[in-house]
Amino acid sequence: MKEELDPNKKTILVVDDEKPIIDILVYNLKKEGYNTLEATDGEMGINVALEARPDLILLDVMLPKVDGLTVCNRVKQVYNVPILMISARDEEVDKIVGLELGADDYITKPFSVRELMARVKANLRKNDDENNAKEKKKDTKIVVGDLELDL
């Protein structure tokens, strides 16, 4: 049975091939008041992300079928969504590659659930602030008589 998403809540897609990790993340995200979607491989992650357009993606780097770095790159080409990479790979070069391919944040396994939830909130807040600034900028006009100035 597919769970209905509450349109008043942010939706987070969890993409990981380890079911225990998905279960922990989904439990904690729901406890924080988020809708959740799940994908267990990279191909499914791309499909769910592009179909459902979640507000944030938690994305493992090492995935079957399509790796997380490729998922990140493909999704970011279509729409701007905060992506938080989760990986057992903690080398600096891995973090840099993930961030350069479009990830907004990177956390290594094992991770603190409390830290991860704080990062989720921070990335959602940052994205909301950016969207609000774009919307405000789009609506800023000065009209004097017949003269209209877009700011």
Q: What residues fall within each predicted segment?
A:
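Short, Lys/Arg-enriched segments at the junction into DNA-binding effector domains
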Residues: N8-T11, A122-L151
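The feature encodes the CheY-like receiver
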Residues: I22, P64, E91, K109
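Charged docking surfaces used in two-component/phosphorelay signaling
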Residues: D23-K31
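Short hydrophobic/Thr-rich beta-strand motif most characteristic of the beta2 strand and flanking loop
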Residues: G33-T40, V48
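Acidic catalytic/metal-coordinating carboxylates
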Residues: D41-M44, D67-T70, V75, D94
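Conserved phosphotransfer cores of two-component systems
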Residues: L50-A52, R74-V81, L101
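Active-site beta3 strand of CheY-like receiver
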Residues: A52-L58, L63
